[in-house]
From Swiss-Prot:
Gene Ontology biological process terms in this record: proteolysis; viral translational frameshifting
Keywords: Aspartyl protease, Autocatalytic cleavage, ERV, Hydrolase, Protease, Transposable element
Catalyses which reaction(s): Processing at the authentic HIV-1 PR recognition site and release of the mature p17 matrix and the p24 capsid protein, as a result of the cleavage of the -SQNY-|-PIVQ- cleavage site
Chain's role: Retroviral proteases have roles in the processing of the primary translation products and the maturation of the viral particle. Endogenous Pro proteins may have kept, lost or modified their original function during evolution.
Organism: Homo sapiens
Active-site annotation: 26
Protein name: Endogenous retrovirus group K member 19 Pro protein
Family membership: Belongs to the peptidase A2 family. HERV class-II K(HML-2) subfamily.
Domain Peptidase A2 residues, every copy: 21-96
Single GO MF annotation: nucleic acid binding
PTM field: Autoproteolytically processed at the N-terminus. Expected C-terminal autoprocessing not detected. The sequence shown is that of the processed Pro protein.
Disulfide bonds listed in the record: none
Amino acid sequence: WASQVSENRPVCKAIIQGKQFEGLVDTGADVSIIALNQWPKNWPKQKAVTGLVGIGTASEVYQSTEILHCLGPDNQESTVQPMITSIPLNLWGRDLLQQWGAEITMPAPLYSPTSQKIMTKMGYILGKGLGKNEDGIKIPVEAKINQKREGIGYPF
């Protein structure tokens, strides 16, 4: 699973105890939180000993009484004992993200700053392809080495 930072929130699906949930990837949350209205009524929960900070005022805060089996977005095996409260959407916190091997990466630019300035002056728009309709190749073409030296017209 991968998600580029955009105006859309990074959400992904997880399967907890065989039930599918969708949640927001939240690297700022220590623990995962399931929305109270999505928590199955037959799953046991207890009043939480600690409150939740950073999500506003939560009057009812519960925690699962059991450690639950979870499959991440790419079927990563994990376990979770989520908090449960009235929030609009589920939050996948670092307790799950670490088990899923989540990473935050910022790729190096494909082109040097100098070449980007030259291309911008020529009408290049970042994220668009080159060409009349800006629909050309968006990544650099890699040269392929022909180890057999075939196709150049001369037998060796």
